[in-house]
A protein has these predicted regions:
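An N-terminal assembly and electron-transfer interface module characteristic of large anaerobic redox
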Residues: 2, 7, 72, 111-113
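Positively charged, amphipathic and often flexible ligand-engagement surfaces
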Residues: 2-5, 10-11, 53, 67, ...
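An N-cap/entry alpha-helix motif that binds or orients negatively charged groups
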Residues: 2-42
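Glycine-rich, positively charged N-terminal anion/phosphate-binding segment
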Residues: 10-19, 42-51, 55, 68-87
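Alpha/beta enzyme core
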Residues: 24-28, 37-60, 84, 100, ...
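Short glycine-rich or small-residue beta-strand-to-loop segments that form or flank ligand, phosphate
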Residues: 30-35, 60-65, 90-94
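Conserved beta-strand edge residues that scaffold enzyme active sites
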Residues: 66, 96, 124-125
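Metabolite-binding pocket within alpha/beta catalytic cores that recognizes anionic/polar moieties
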Residues: 71-107, 116
Length: 186
């Protein structure tokens, strides 16, 4: 897909790895969706997704509620988009409030569904836990989650030869909880 004469990969039902998306020439754009909590809202959102499909975004990302509060809803929306549209869904996956085995289980479910990419994030604690103790999470930071996804890929657990494409996000101005930007880079 990279190296084609299109500004971004053609959106098809064939796998599109996030690296291919960002290695293409020209502009790229995406849409981000938050999974609704009711069936009626889900159908309304999916109708909108089908209408936006004709815009041919490079990918669509699906958020993951604070502390994984929308874990199942996110998974269901990602799989529905994957199976019924030509769009490339990229689910957010956060490490807050998750054990290592939970993360492994989530990755396995996405791999088995044919999902090619993950957006690895630290995430926010649930609203009712503003003082959440991150030391109790299996991965305190997204960098550790990225390592776990790479280990998952290296174990050959994903059916695709490349495994998951991994996207990350950052704070250009520095993470609010980091008192020293130089230390943050380490």
């Amino acid at each position: 897909m990279a190296g084609n004469n299109q500004p971004w990969p053609a959106t098809t039902l064939s796998p599109v790895h996030i690296n291919d998306i960002f290695n293409c020439q020209g502009p790229s754009f995406s849409f981000e969706f938050f999974p609704p909590k009711t069936g009626e809202a889900s159908e309304k959102l999916f109708k909108t997704i089908k209408e936006l499909e004709s815009c041919r975004p490079s990918f669509v990302s699906i958020t993951y509620g604070a502390g994984g509060s929308t874990r199942q809803l996110t998974h269901d929306l990602v799989v529905r988009i994957k199976n019924t549209t030509s769009l490339t869904p990229i689910p957010h996956l956060t490490c807050v409030c998750h054990s290592g085995s939970e993360i492994s289980g989530i990755l396995t479910r996405y791999a088995n569904a044919g999902v090619e990419n993950i957006l690895a994030l630290r995430g926010d604690p649930p609203r009712d836990q503003p003082e959440h103790d991150h030391s109790k999470d299996a991965f305190q930071y997204a960098g550790k989650l990225v390592k776990a996804i790479k280990q998952f890929n290296n174990a050959g657990t994903h059916p695709a030869p490349k495994g998951f494409g991994i996207g990350v996000a950052g704070f250009p101005e520095g993470h609010p909880s980091t008192p020293n930007r130089i230390k943050e880079l380490d």
